[in-house]
Structure formats: structure tokens, C-alpha cells
A protein has these predicted regions:
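Internal, well-folded beta-alpha domain core
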Residues: 151, 157-161, 210, 215-227, ...
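Residue-level signal for secondary-structure boundary elements
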Residues: 53, 140, 144, 156, ...
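Generic alpha-helix structural propensity
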Residues: 50, 61-63, 80, 90-93, ...
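Sequence/fold signature of self-assembling virion shell proteins
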Residues: 2-52, 59-60, 69, 73, ...
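Structured, hydrophobic secondary-structure cores that serve as assembly/anchoring elements
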Residues: 62, 67, 97-124, 194-228
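Surface-exposed polar/charged interaction patches
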Residues: 12-15, 150, 202, 206
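N-terminal low-complexity, intrinsically disordered segments
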Residues: 62-96
């Protein structure tokens, strides 16, 4: 039986195309067909803004900075009967303050030609708006991680009296059971679990409340904790998978400390740029693996919450385009260094 003599309705002037491997060989047969686009935008996975909501945040109006008072412990002593109590038992006072200053206005902007918006088969403006908002969110999270790291590495005592010493940050350095060439994933996971426990104990020794403590790890190290013999082992956590499970790919707590994952725990060294008003942003997290912290370790000032501005009127007419601007005004800084511990390698 003879092959069919097909009328290829996608050809231009009846020519083009060949029966061969590859899309290019078929293009001639499909030249007149409509090039459809998917309604679903294939965008990058959104990074989670993990640190927001886990640190102290304050709104500010009518000012450029906010002072947080630092008070220390008071001492107690026996009273000798008959002697006058003059209030000098805790004299001189031991007070200080930390001042957080707003940085310059932070923006993420994009200008889109109106003609392009009309021709696009997908909601281009909505996607651009989302990406601009995410740019601000990611910068918020990255800066917060650097400030927590700065708190953990802060070795300056804020107060003078001996009773108030020790209010500085802490670090835990992972050993050969993590860094060794022969270290297994299970051994590395156990090392991280032990380090998280050490971090919690270090804060408890400084009278840091155990509530509101969080631990954030990078993706690699969060996955290593899953391979630990203790994090999700039923011998340590009871049955029922109440602390997560290997199948779910999640661990809820280690020694009572909730675990979270963020891509911002490890960062290259940051150099201050024009607009930064806090030298503590300049940190090198390239060897950092985890941050264990109480919410009081740092503060965030917010003068202007993330918002979107869209141009209209004369600007659009003269340029035949639309300008989209996402903006926020904030400042960050260390508050209580004793409330932060950084876990990393040497």
C-alpha cells in the first residue's frame, strides 16, 4: 500500500521540513502554527524569608533611630539590724544602651514598556511585582542573618560590674567528626546535633530564656541532621514521628530547639556600601553552618514597611512605559549578644 501524500498545512508555500531527529528538522512543517505560551510562569523557587518574625521588631515614626536600654542584674546582701538602709547597695548603677539607626531607603525597581505589556501572553506586570517584593524580602533575611552572626561574635561587654559579665556572644566550632575527610553523613549529623545542644547550654549559662530560641541551618546541614542517629530516631524522640521523619524530610526540634532551613545562613563576606548605616552588616559567613538565637539577640526598626509604587499620568505618557518600585525603610543591629551562637568550621 502506498504512503499518503500529505498536505502539510504548517508549511510556508508548501516547502520546508524533513523527517529527521531534532526540532529544527520539524520546524518547516510547523512554520505557520501559533507559538503558544504556558499560562503558568516558570519562575525560580521562592526562597523563604525565615528570620522575619523570629527577632525583635519595632515600628518607628518621626525619627531616625531608636535606643534600647540595657540594664544589668542587681546584687543582694544581708542587712545588719539597726543600720540605715540608704539605697547604696547597688550604687553605682550599671546601665547602658544600644542605638539602632535606620539605613537609607531600599528599593527594587523595574520599568516596562506599555507595548510589551499589551503583547505579552502572560501577566508580566504581576510577575515583575512579585519579584521586586521578593528582592526586598531576601535582602531583609540576608541582613538579619549577618546581624545574628555579628551578635554571636560580639566580645564587648555592655556593662561594667562583675555580676553582669558574660553578656557576649558565643561560637561553636565543629571538629573532625564534621570536617574530617572520612566523616560520614551520620557522623556529621550527630556533630551538628551536639553543637546545637552546646549552643543551647551556652545560652542557658547566661540566663537566656529557653523560650523563643530558634536554630536555622543551611540546606546541606539541615539534610545532615536528618541523617543523624538522634534527631529523628524513635529511641530518642518516642514513636509516632512527632519530631518529623526521614520520609517527610523534616526535623522539628533538637533538644527543644526548633529547626528551620535558609539559604542565607552561609554567605560570602559582605562589604559595606553607601546607604548602610550599621557597620555590623559587614560579616563573613562563608564558614558558618548554623545560627542558634533568641529573638532578643537583634532588633529591627521599620519606618516604612514593604510597599509598591506604580507611576501614572505624565511619566507614563512621556516614556510610554510603567515604572514599578518596591521600597522599604529599615535598620538592624545587635541588641543582646549573649542571645546568639554561631556554629561553623574553623
Amino acid at each position: 500500500m502506498a504512503d499518503a501524500d500529505l498536505k502539510r498545512i504548517g508549511q510556508i508555500k508548501g516547502t520546508g521540513g524533513s523527517w529527521a531527529a531534532g526540532a529544527a528538522a520539524q520546524d518547516g512543517y510547523r512554520a505557520l502554527f501559533l507559538k503558544l505560551g504556558s499560562a503558568e510562569i516558570l519562575s525560580a523557587f521562592e526562597e523563604s524569608c525565615i528570620f522575619k518574625g523570629k527577632v525583635k521588631e519595632r515600628n518607628i515614626r518621626g525619627g531616625k533611630s531608636l535606643a534600647f536600654p540595657i540594664s544589668g542584674k542587681q546584687s543582694a546582701s544581708y542587712h545588719q539590724p539597726g543600720t540605715e538602709i540608704t539605697g547604696g547597695g547597688n550604687d553605682p548603677s550599671d546601665l547602658n544602651e544600644r542605638v539602632l539607626t535606620l539605613d537609607s531607603l531600599m528599593i527594587a525597581d523595574a520599568a516596562v514598556a506599555d507595548i510589551d505589556l499589551l503583547m505579552a501572553y502572560w501577566d508580566q506586570r504581576q510577575e515583575i511585582t512579585r519579584e521586586l517584593g521578593l528582592a526586598l524580602a531576601y535582602e531583609w533575611d540576608r541582613r538579619a542573618a549577618r546581624i545574628i552572626f555579628a551578635a554571636a561574635n560580639n566580645s564587648t561587654e555592655p556593662l561594667a560590674k562583675a555580676i553582669n559579665t558574660g553578656r557576649i556572644g558565643s561560637t561553636v566550632t565543629l571538629g573532625a567528626d564534621y570536617t574530617g575527610a572520612s566523616a560520614t553523613r551520620q557522623e556529621k549529623g550527630d556533630a551538628l546535633v551536639a553543637a546545637i545542644g552546646d549552643a543551647k547550654v551556652a545560652m542557658q549559662k547566661k540566663d537566656v530564656p529557653t523560650s523563643d530560641i530558634s536554630c536555622v541551618l543551611g540546606p546541606d546541614d539541615y539534610d545532615l541532621v536528618l541523617d543523624s542517629t538522634r534527631a529523628i530516631n524513635t529511641d530518642y524522640n518516642g514513636g509516632g514521628g512527632g519530631n518529623g521523619g526521614f520520609a517527610d524530610g523534616r526535623v522539628l526540634r533538637v533538644k527543644g530547639v526548633p529547626l528551620y532551613m535558609s539559604n542565607h545562613v552561609t554567605q560570602d563576606a559582605y562589604t559595606l556600601v553607601a546607604g548602610d548605616c550599621n557597620a555590623e552588616y559587614a560579616q563573613d559567613l562563608s564558614n558558618n553552618k548554623a545560627l542558634v538565637f533568641h529573638k532578643d539577640c537583634m532588633g529591627v526598626l521599620s519606618l516604612l514597611s514593604p510597599s509598591l509604587q506604580v507611576t501614572s499620568g505624565d511619566w507614563n505618557i512621556s516614556r510610554q512605559s510603567t515604572l514599578l518600585v518596591a521600597r522599604q525603610s529599615l535598620g538592624m543591629g545587635v541588641l543582646r549578644a549573649e542571645c546568639a551562637v554561631a556554629i561553623g568550621t574553623a
